[in-house]
Swiss-Prot record:
<dbReference type="Pfam" id="PF00871">
    <property type="entry name" value="Acetate_kinase"/>
</dbReference>
<keyword id="KW-0067">ATP-binding</keyword>
<feature type="active site" description="Proton donor/acceptor">
    <location>
        <position position="148"/>
    </location>
</feature>
<keyword id="KW-0460">Magnesium</keyword>
<dbReference type="InterPro" id="IPR023865">
    <property type="entry name" value="Aliphatic_acid_kinase_CS"/>
</dbReference>
<feature type="binding site">
    <location>
        <position position="388"/>
    </location>
    <ligand>
        <name>Mg(2+)</name>
    </ligand>
</feature>
<feature type="binding site">
    <location>
        <begin position="283"/>
        <end position="285"/>
    </location>
    <ligand>
        <name>ATP</name>
    </ligand>
</feature>
<keyword id="KW-0479">Metal-binding</keyword>
<comment type="similarity">
    <text>Belongs to the acetokinase family.</text>
</comment>
<dbReference type="GO" id="GO:0005524">
    <property type="term" value="F:ATP binding"/>
</dbReference>
<feature type="binding site">
    <location>
        <position position="91"/>
    </location>
    <ligand>
        <name>substrate</name>
    </ligand>
</feature>
<keyword id="KW-0418">Kinase</keyword>
<feature type="site" description="Transition state stabilizer">
    <location>
        <position position="241"/>
    </location>
</feature>
<keyword id="KW-0808">Transferase</keyword>
<feature type="site" description="Transition state stabilizer">
    <location>
        <position position="180"/>
    </location>
</feature>
<keyword id="KW-0547">Nucleotide-binding</keyword>
<comment type="subunit">
    <text>Homodimer.</text>
</comment>
Amino acid sequence: MIILTLNCGSSSVKYQVYNWTERAVIAVGVVERVTQAGSVITHEVHGRENHVRESPCPTHTEAVQLIISTLTDAHVGVISDMSLIKAVGHRVLHAADRFVKSVVVTPDVLETFRSVQDLGPLHNPANIRGIEAAQAVIPSVPHCAIMDTAWHQTMPEASFMYAVPRQWYEEYAVRRYGFHGTSFLYTAKRASVILKKRAEDTNIIIAHIGNGASMCCVKNGVSFDTSMGITPLEGLIMGTRCGDCDPALAFYIMRKTGMSVSDIDTTLNKQSGLLGITGKYVDRRDVCAAMKNGDALARLAFDMEVHRIRKYFGAYVAALGKQPDALVFTAGVGEMCCDVRAAACAGLEHLGIRLDARKNELARTRNAETEISTDDSPVRILVIPTDEELVMTEDTYALMQGTYDVHTRFTYSFQDPTYVNKARAAGLKRDLEKNPALATIVVPRLDT
């Protein structure tokens, strides 16, 4: 059974094709510059050279058509006919508090997404266009929506409410929603397996650090608090987003410069964060390289980012009311940047967080779950490569089968202690050939 997952942005459509019967990813790719000149698809199949082709995509419909034609192409495709695709899963950023779990897309569901798109103006319109485009191109199969906000619907009111007039919540749905929920769900469930705990007994703090970044306090296996707010702008310092700042800053700059609300929105979302501090860098690799070459602003950006992460670590230890079982790093930077991890954990020994420098240096792989804490650290420090697409695929499959439920009453395949990601296992084998010492930090240990 073939399941297609789509992640539609304003100018891109990312996709993955999963063979559920074989439990294997058979293709991934992205169409970039959608709605712009020079639209191009990059199609990746393990064991083959990447296929790159330009093709006009004035709308998301043409982008989905391009994906389907590529998947079924006699030379570069992976399926013989579109009819082999039995369902499509769609990532949806913002569903407010309307859904606590993934759903099959119906006209009423789409209307709900439209009704809350003001809460996610940078993402939701594109998500909706992507769903409509895919339904037009592949009309005969179920389409399912997997929402970033659903995971966080377990937060208590004291965590999600803002100290603003209650009327704003009641009339305009102003509250903390949180994002990266699919990633947090996956890493929380995998952490429980690694820790050999039941999900409902697991208390951890997760740092999802990519270009977008947020943290989640997981108490008794569910989201208890998170750093992003009504939009993804709040919280950690990100590639182009400012994260936490005094709201009056916007009013001050508007009075001083005459900037509009739209100008401020664009600046705080797309011209701030690491880019705003350094004036030129968004990628952490560039920041770290420049910092090591003496760039003072790159050093400042790095120090500000990790200071913010440490503050949230401390806050969430307090919110848990107990020592966490583990700190978990995930997403591109969290999985690969040992400098950020080391600095984020520095000075937290009094909280029971003890990083092993050698292990941390070794942990640069997306093909294995690793442990980078010292052997005597009261709090374990884990690096768990996220797999949002697998959650999307599994939710979609379970919805088709009628077996799906909210995550506290549903068991995922990756919660099985014997679960193996075939592609990552093959990648780990190659990694170990290059660096045998990696076996000493993989969990469970491979050198014993």
